[in-house]
């Protein structure tokens, strides 16, 4: 087969201007980016699949060669498979996410269980300890994501949870400020890449159309963590032994995480093609339904520098990073809640129950958000923007209300706490709105760095000199975290709508021209091979794959 002309080839390296027509991405001098040539083809073109390098192919390519004669699922079979994935993959991820946030919240509950007295720290040092967690979180992003791409996902997740189990247990040995700082730093380090890993996993098993609906379930597990954690904290205060309540709390949480680690080691999937809880036929259908819906690959273990560059040049990457930075400036409210409750004359014992009520409110909000997203689809920006309204209202009430209105202040604090819904929506949207495994991981790193930097700053806004009203912290939250953030989401939507209009116009002219890619590479024997491949079989970025339509 003749090689496509240079005029038909797209140079990835130079395609940094996302506002141009995709047809303009042509470099007649360079011809193509090494190993990948994108060409528009006709129906009569060859559809053969030569033996090309794994650097180009998606990880599940070989597995999917067995699905060439796969018969389409009936609606009933598709529903049965989808619900099986919900009760295996989604439940597993929700449990992991819940324990991840319970571990983060251990310090918050320990603050009312005797931590301050046993370790001789004050409120400002408590804020510094929270900051150190996110310093470790930032430092762990790049090495964590590199390990994630290099090693099997299941082993990476199990190793991370095993390390954080050990660190949680070691908290019981801490007796001063320095010890707590070191432990929280390393806890942030080992937990740093787990949230992006879970997002990558959900992207392997569910198409974009379903991912947006499933994201609020992560919010349920995130804020729902305060329900079991609150009851555990409530119970340990009745324990009659020589162990401090906060240490007993750490031991119980560490024990639960230990058993979770064992389960993850055996059952967490590396990718769709190796999931133990699915039959071989179910794995084939799962990969097939994700590919056909997303028009993109699922996983690649080869690091691609050009995808990193493309991610950094994409303005959407930076807008998502800026959004999560603004949003998470208010995240320390979750760590301050128990202290705020006690400052309103709620006892240590009862503050744990108020925390449970707050978690219940947030879970109900997440269920409502999920229902709204299932009814009004492909409107992530508007759904996210709407859920900032309760936070703004609650924040203004906290600032404006007299401190004597204790019940009103409690209610306002709880109402203000559901800013996590837009965070979860944007977390899923940031990875769903790009393609290319290295690009997804790069965008995930940027997103988590923005998340971590905001959480480094956040604790420092709650200075003891501003107690008990903490006006500076509330003003930053109202003005930046909850008022600027929704506009960032709307700007992202505006950009993606413009891109989709151009792509849909091209696909309307001739869809099949943009669904295949011409590949030239060297196989394992050193031979030069080339041929046309379906885009869904390859690890292409959204900029290379013109059949990729951005979810809104």
UniProtKB/Swiss-Prot annotation:
It is a multi-pass membrane protein. One of its GO terms (cellular component) is endoplasmic reticulum. GO terms for biological process: cysteine transmembrane transport; cysteine transport. The chain crosses the membrane at residues 83-103, 163-183, 185-205, 216-236, 248-268, 353-373, 381-401, 410-430, 444-464, 472-492. GO terms for molecular function: cysteine transmembrane transporter activity. The keyword Transcription regulation does not apply. It is found in: Membrane. InterPro entries: MFS, MFS_trans_sf. It holds the Pfam family MFS_1. The keyword Cell membrane does not apply. Residues 1-23 are annotated as: Disordered. Keywords: Membrane, Transmembrane, Transmembrane helix, Transport. Belongs to the major facilitator superfamily. Allantoate permease family. This is Uncharacterized transporter PB10D8.01.
């Amino acid at each position: 087969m003749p090689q496509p002309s240079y005029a038909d080839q797209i140079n990835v390296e130079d395609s940094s201007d996302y506002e141009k027509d995709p047809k303009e991405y042509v470099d007649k001098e360079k011809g193509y980016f090494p190993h990948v040539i994108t060409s528009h083809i006709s129906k009569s073109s060859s559809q053969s699949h030569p033996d090309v390098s794994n650097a180009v192919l998606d990880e599940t390519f070989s597995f999917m060669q067995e699905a060439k004669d796969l018969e389409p699922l009936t609606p009933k079979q598709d529903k049965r498979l989808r619900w099986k994935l919900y009760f295996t993959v989604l439940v597993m991820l929700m449990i992991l996410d819940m324990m991840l946030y319970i571990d983060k919240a251990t310090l918050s509950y320990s603050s009312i269980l005797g931590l301050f007295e046993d370790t001789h720290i004050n409120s400002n040092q408590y804020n510094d300890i929270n900051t150190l967690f996110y310093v470790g979180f930032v430092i762990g992003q790049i090495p964590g994501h590199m390990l994630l791409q290099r090693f099997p996902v299941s082993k990476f997740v199990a190793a991370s949870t095993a390390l954080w189990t050990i660190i949680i247990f070691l908290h019981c040995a801490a007796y001063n400020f320095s010890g707590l700082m070191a432990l929280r730093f390393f806890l942030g380090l080992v937990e740093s890449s787990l949230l992006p890993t879970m997002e990558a996993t959900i992207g392997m098993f569910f198409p974009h159309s379903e991912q947006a609906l499933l994201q609020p379930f992560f919010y349920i597990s995130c804020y729902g963590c305060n329900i079991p954690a609150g009851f555990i904290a409530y119970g340990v205060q009745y324990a009659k032994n020589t162990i401090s309540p906060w240490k007993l709390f750490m031991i119980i949480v560490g024990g639960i995480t230990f058993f979770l680690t064992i389960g993850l080691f055996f059952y967490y999937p590396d990718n769709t093609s190796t999931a133990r809880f699915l039959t071989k036929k179910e794995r084939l259908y799962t990969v097939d339904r994700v590919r056909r819906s997303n028009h993109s690959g699922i996983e690649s273990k080869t690091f691609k520098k050009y995808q990193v560059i493309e991610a950094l040049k994409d303005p959407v990457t930076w807008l998502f990073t800026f959004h999560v930075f603004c949003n998470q400036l208010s995240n320390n409210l979750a760590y301050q809640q128990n202290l705020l409750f006690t400052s309103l004359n709620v006892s240590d014992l009862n503050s744990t129950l108020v925390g449970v009520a707050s978690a219940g409110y947030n879970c109900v909000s997440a269920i409502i958000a999920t229902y709204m997203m299932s009814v009004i689809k492909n409107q992530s920006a508007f759904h996210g923007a709407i859920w900032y309204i309760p936070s703004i209202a609650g924040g203004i009430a906290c600032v404006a209300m007299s401190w004597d209105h204790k019940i009103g202040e409690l209610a306002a604090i709880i109402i203000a706490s559901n800013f996590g819904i837009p965070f979860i929506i944007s977390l899923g949207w940031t990875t769903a709105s790009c393609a290319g495994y290295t690009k997804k991981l790069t965008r995930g790193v940027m997103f988590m760095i923005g998340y971590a930097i905001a959480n480094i700053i956040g604790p420092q806004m709650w200075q003891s000199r501003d107690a008990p009203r903490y006006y500076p912290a509330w003003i930053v939250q109202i003005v930046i975290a909850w008022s600027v953030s929704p506009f960032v989401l709307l700007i992202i939507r505006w950009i993606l709508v413009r891109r989709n209009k151009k792509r849909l116009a091209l696909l309307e002219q001739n869809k099949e021209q943009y669904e295949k890619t011409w590949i030239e590479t060297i196989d394992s024997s050193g031979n030069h091979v080339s041929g046309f491949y379906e885009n869904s079989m390859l690890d292409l970025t959204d900029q290379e794959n013109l059949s990729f339509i951005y979810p809104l």
